[in-house]
């Protein structure tokens, strides 16, 4: 049964007090995770906050957004973990209903955190607020001058900024933003501050906002410099400047003026577009599938193999192909899907290849629809000599060449590479380098882990906690999502939802960076008088064939197209250069020149 649209969206902000210290030589590095109980009684992850270093009283700036449904009892579980580089230690958890938060004065609850043995592990305060979505983003810069000197040595100050907004019902403030530290300056510049208008002020232009400035210290408590209060409407006024006031100094010194000044520059509100607007405007989504052909999967003829074709149901590879493919393919203008293998030896070859066509035909990498991908996989996996090792970089570089073709305002495309694998990668450095270099392209990478292997390194590739770096260069955007199939066995809909959860955010980050706007929705096709009706869910089977190739588009089959290089015009298929009237496509593995994406 489909869920009703949410009554509204609610933002949860979390802070903790005196949590257990799990670290021996320092303090815990806490992170909060929030889960909601689904209709099957299982807790489903809604979101995570950032990790705060060395803090037993963390106030998380990352909000957790949840759909509020009036007609349901929504049970929430809050977990706090101490997050180290390669491990997470459970600190404590607490549960309550969303209604219990919303019905409290100030929409605020205080919960006791408990360990797994039921012992006290600290406390947690949760504040809820309804989100009024205006689809607007506010941007501004802050320029500080003559801040108070706080350090005896050096330049005298290492300032950073905290922005908080007022909660009217409780007359308190919640932290929404924290800047990087500006090292060694009394004249800090906080540039490129950007957030949704709802996040800054809840959509209320008169909502009070607090700007606090602190001097960062390596050891001990950070020193308070001062603060000023304003609202979004004032921020947008030209030539705004504020005194940074330290109330303690103001009370003690009769001639006190300020602890510095801050002026506002380039404050603007920009319209924010949503994912659906781009899709409705004709943006082409493309899927590329990569299949692990390493020996660790087991001989495909062995019933214990991950590649075994089981008459009783789909194996995990086929399950991933169907779950994700059936969601993405409806957004494509053609059903053609490139499919590649890696870590195997093709028939007639002696060398391992880390990016080869699963069709086993170098001039034809395309399959028609999800069924065509399945047919190709089942027909050819037994013909490939499973080998190894597991390398991702060649496959990612191929997808990057594919994604780099023909992007423009009028011809928008976005590529999703789905890699299905059973084990750890052995070219981590090269893979990270390929991901970093691809992070500026219209590309997302989904990694689905099958089987019971240790997938620790995969979580490193998923840059949720920290941006990937290679050779001193940071990734422009997070483009990787990893999901372990074993967590979603027999739940294909939930698998697809989790695998694709980050795609809209990754998609929008690219479009926003390069200032691509949604195109107007194309007009509906003309109605031809006397023509038979066209259904999106036909109940009878008809045979549709391509006029040039004779392909039965209702059957899962490989597309018999020749590959030739075309330079004249980009194609609606997202870089494959497909001309269905001529039956030719670009060979995306050879000689493709990159397109420079310039910010307009």
Curated annotation (Swiss-Prot):
Tell me the organism.
Dictyostelium discoideum (Social amoeba)
The protein here is known as Copine-A
- Keywords, alphabetical: Calcium, Cytoplasm, Membrane, Metal-binding, Repeat
Q: How does it sit in the membrane?
A: Peripheral membrane protein
- GO biological process, alphabetically ordered: cellular response to calcium ion; contractile vacuole discharge; contractile vacuole organization; culmination involved in sorocarp development; hypotonic response; mitotic cytokinesis; negative regulation of exocytosis; positive phototaxis
Q: Where is this region: Disordered?
A: 535-583
Source organism superkingdom: Eukaryota
One GO location term (cellular component) = late endosome membrane
Binding positions (Ca(2+) 4): 151, 215, 217, 223
Protein function? Required for cytokinesis, contractile vacuole function and development.
Q: Which family does it belong to?
A: Belongs to the copine family.
> Which residues hold Ca(2+) 2?
23, 82, 84, 89
List of residues binding Ca(2+) 1: 23, 29, 82, 84
**Compositionally biased, Polar residues: which spans?**
555-572
Task: List, for all copies, the residue spans of the domain called C2.
Answer: 1-111, 116-246
């Amino acid at each position: 049964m489909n869920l009703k649209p949410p009554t509204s969206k609610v933002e949860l902000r979390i802070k903790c007090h005196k949590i257990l210290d799990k670290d021996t030589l320092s303090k815990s590095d806490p992170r909060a995770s929030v889960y909601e109980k689904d209709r099957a009684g299982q807790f489903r992850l809604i979101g995570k906050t950032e990790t705060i270093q060395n803090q037993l009283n963390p106030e998380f700036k990352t909000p957790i957004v949840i759909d509020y449904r009036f007609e349901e009892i929504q049970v929430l579980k809050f977990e706090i973990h101490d997050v180290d580089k390669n491990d997470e230690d459970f600190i404590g958890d607490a549960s309550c209903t969303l209604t219990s938060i919303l019905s409290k004065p100030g929409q605020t609850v205080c919960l006791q955190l408990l360990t797994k043995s039921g012992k006290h592990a600290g406390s947690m305060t949760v504040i809820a607020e309804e989100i009024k979505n205006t689809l607007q983003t506010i941007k501004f810069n802050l320029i500080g001058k003559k801040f108070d000197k706080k350090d005896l040595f050096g330049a005298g100050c290492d300032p950073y900024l905290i922005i908080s907004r007022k909660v009217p019902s409780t007359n308190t403030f919640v932290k929404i933003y924290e800047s990087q530290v500006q090292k060694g300056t009394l004249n800090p510049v906080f540039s490129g501050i950007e957030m949704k208008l709802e996040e800054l002020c809840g959509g209320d232009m008169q909502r009070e906002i607090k700007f606090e400035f602190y001097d960062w210290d390596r050891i001990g408590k950070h020193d308070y410099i001062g603060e000023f209060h304003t609202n979004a409407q004032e921020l947008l006024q030209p030539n705004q400047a504020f005194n940074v006031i330290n109330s303690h100094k103001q009370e003690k010194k009769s001639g006190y003026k300020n602890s510095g000044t801050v002026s506002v520059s380039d404050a603007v509100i920009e319209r924010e577009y949503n994912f659906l607007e781009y899709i409705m405007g004709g943006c082409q989504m493309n899927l590329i599938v990569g299949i692990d052909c390493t020996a660790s999967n087991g001989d495909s003829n062995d019933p214990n193999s991950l590649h075994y074709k089981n008459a009783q149901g789909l194996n995990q590879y086929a399950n991933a192909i169907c779950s994700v493919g059936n969601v993405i393919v409806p957004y494509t203008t053609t059903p053609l899907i490139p499919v590649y293998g890696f870590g195997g030896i093709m028939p007639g070859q002696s060398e391992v290849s880390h990016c080869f066509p699963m069709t086993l035909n170098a001039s034809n990498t395309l399959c028609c629809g999800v069924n065509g991908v399945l047919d190709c996989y089942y027909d050819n996996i037994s013909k490939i000599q499973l080998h190894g090792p597991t390398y991702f970089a060649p496959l990612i570089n191929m997808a990057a060449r594919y994604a780099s073709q023909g992007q423009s305002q009028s011809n928008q495309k976005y590529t999703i590479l789905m890699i299905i694998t059973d084990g750890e990668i052995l070219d981590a450095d090269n893979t990270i380098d390929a991901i970093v270099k691809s992070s500026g392209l219209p590309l997302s990478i989904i990694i689905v882990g099958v089987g019971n292997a240790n997938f620790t390194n995969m979580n490193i590739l998923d840059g949720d906690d920290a941006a990937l770096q290679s050779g001193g260069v940071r990734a422009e955007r997070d483009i990787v999502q990893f999901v372990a199939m074993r967590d979603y066995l027999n739940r294909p809909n939930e698998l697809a939802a989790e695998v694709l959860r980050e795609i809209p955010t990754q998609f929008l980050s690219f479009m926003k960076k390069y200032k691509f706007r949604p195109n107007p929705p194309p007009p509906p096709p003309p109605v031809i008088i006397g023509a038979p009706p066209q259904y999106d869910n036909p109940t009878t089977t008809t045979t549709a064939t391509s006029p040039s190739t004779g392909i039965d588009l209702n059957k899962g089959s490989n597309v018999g197209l020749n590959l030739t290089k075309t330079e004249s015009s980009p194609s609606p298929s997202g870089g494959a250069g497909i001309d269905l009237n001529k039956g030719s496509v670009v060979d995306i593995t050879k000689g493709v020149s990159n397109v420079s994406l310039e910010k307009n």
